[in-house]
Design a protein with these regions (language model features):
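Bacterial N-terminal signal peptides
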Residues: 36-48
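Long, repeat-rich segments with strong aromatic
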Residues: 239, 243-327
Length: 400
């Protein structure tokens, strides 16, 4: 018995030491686990906060940094902002004298099959859209309730009346003319008097009609695809549908270097005979606007993508040169060019005005300088108020 007790004591001591060792190991493992979980949780929260910060900057097309920058210029009575702002307010005020043109079936025949019918049936959406857009911006700058309410009048009209789109160009026109409704809605997101039922109604219309129209043609590799992707991006930003938003981004990247040649010409658009320069603009305007929306929503910068010399900058330079030297355009004799007297507005000046700060281009600035402030308020809506609302990739630290 005397011999057994020491052995039991020794065994018990070993067991206690082993138990202590095991307990320590478990504690270390649990500590490491908690540290890892805490790190993962921290990363997750930071990601959410980071995304929230991006979205908190404001609308997809007009981030708060941009709005605040312009407010400061207006406060300082700086031109051309003051004059451009007066033009905006005049446009917004004109919306109080017109009724909405929403229709149950937005049916638009093909332009080349029925030009008169196409233009007539498109005009209602174009007038309502620019009215909503200009009023939403006017509210953003002035805080006056009447502008927000007038913008909502047009948004609610389309959300409750319009149920579908049809005919050959219904989806395309809704994409390039209806962008204004989406931008207006995005600007009004923080308007407290936009009731929940009305918001839900507009969300439903955006998802089932507007975005459906855009997504039905976003696979196209020409200007139609460019406009429909912009429309879809704006809808997805408003709906906070990140999955479909990323699908738009994927499509833009997928055919980017198929549509822009190494010398800068737009492969599909120069085929349009006498309208080749116009369609070059008509493709680049929504493409660059899409890049701006992507940058504002995700922080991803696509403006400087380049491959074998092909880039958006080169395409813009190409457009500017041949709009000034149409006699050198090799694809068609006497092509249509954009001027200050153009039917819808001064294209491509509105586009080049918008891009002048993105690419810090004195050529673009010199081209548009005599005509500023520019406003493009008919037909197609990517760069509508380029002088009033300049773009910046550096937080508006340097605007020329």
């Amino acid at each position: 018995m005397k011999n057994i007790l020491p052995l039991l004591f020794i065994s018990s001591s070993k067991l206690m030491r082993q138990k202590t060792t095991i307990t320590s190991a478990v504690r270390i493992a649990l500590t490491r686990y908690h540290v890892c979980m805490l790190a993962a949780l921290t990363f997750f929260l930071l990601t959410i906060l980071s995304n929230a910060e991006v979205n908190a900057k404001g609308a997809a097309m007009h981030p708060e940094e941009q709005i605040n920058f312009v407010k400061q210029q207006l406060k300082n009575k700086k031109e051309p902002y003051v004059k451009a702002f007066k033009m905006l307010i005049k446009k917004a005020d004109s919306s109080f004298h017109v009724s909405h043109h929403a229709v149950e079936d937005f049916g638009v025949p093909g332009f080349y099959q029925d030009k008169e019918g196409h233009q007539r049936l498109s005009l209602g959406l174009q007038r309502d859209g620019i009215s909503a857009y200009s009023c939403a911006l006017a509210w953003k700058f002035t805080g006056k309730k009447k502008y927000a309410e007038r913008a909502l009048y047009f948004l609610n009209s389309w959300a409750t009346v319009n149920k579908k789109y049809s005919q050959l160009d219904g989806s395309l026109v809704m994409s390039y003319s209806g962008t204004t409704l989406m931008i207006a809605a995005d600007l009004l997101k923080d308007y407290k008097n936009w009731t929940t039922p009305d918001r839900e109604s507009f969300n439903l219309w955006t998802r089932n009609v507007f975005r459906h129209a855009a997504n039905s043609i976003r696979f196209r590799n020409n200007n139609s695809g460019d406009w429909s992707r912009l429309a879809s991006l704006l809808a997805n930003a408003f709906l906070d549908d990140q999955e479909d938003f990323q699908e738009d981004v994927r499509l833009i990247k997928k055919d980017f270097f198929n549509k822009i040649a190494e010398d800068g010409h737009m492969v599909e658009e120069v085929k349009r005979e006498g309208n080749g320069i116009w369609y070059t603009y008509f493709s680049l305007a929504p493409l660059t606007a899409s890049m701006w929306v992507i940058y504002n929503e995700s922080g991803e910068n696509l403006f400087f993508m380049e491959k074998n010399g092909a880039s958006v900058k080169k395409a813009l330079d190409y457009l500017l040169y041949y709009n000034q030297h149409p006699q050198e355009w090799k694809y068609f004799k006497n092509p249509r060019v954009g001027t200050v007297n153009s039917q819808y507005g001064f294209w491509p000046a509105n586009l080049l005005d918008a891009m002048s700060n993105i690419y810090d281009s004195n050529d673009y600035r010199q081209y548009v300088a005599p005509y500023r402030p520019l406003m493009y308020v008919q037909h197609d809506y990517a760069w509508t108020f380029p002088t009033l609302l300049p773009l910046s990739l550096d937080g508006y630290k340097e605007i020329k």
